[in-house]
């Protein structure tokens, strides 16, 4: 199975192709296309579970699309830093982190739709979705440790902490029209920026 970003690569690379904002992204995708395809296959395996509902919920969200930016960023960063070994499992750590956070966010925010489909909790219920999100986060931490060692595990734990604190801040300030720029920036730093930083 190809990554959703894989389809961007050919258009941005052939001679004479018009340059667009996505051209650099397409070039990046092409550099790690094999790793992206491997990570996509690996992600399906990592979402497997002896508990059928956990697997079904994980696949429901993962199969609904998404750009797979976290695996792409991981692969490009690793290659730029000179890493030459296999990357698929490490790439999946960031995507599992993202999937777990999306499952949790939709429950916390009462999301009705995700990626053009009913949000997972509308189909499977809040408790099962929250716990599946926990499984995704735990597997991300395990993968980080297995693939990159204790420093990566600590970094991923820091990111999960930042994201969770950002979500609490967002809840505390929900609906406030007097929200200052500093609080807004703190929320997005803890949520989106922390996730991308992994």
Task: Locate predicted features.
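N-terminal amphipathic/basic leader segments beginning at the initiator methionine
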Residues: 1-44
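Mg2+-dependent prenyl diphosphate-binding active-site environment of isoprenoid biosynthetic enzymes
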Residues: 31, 37-38, 44-198
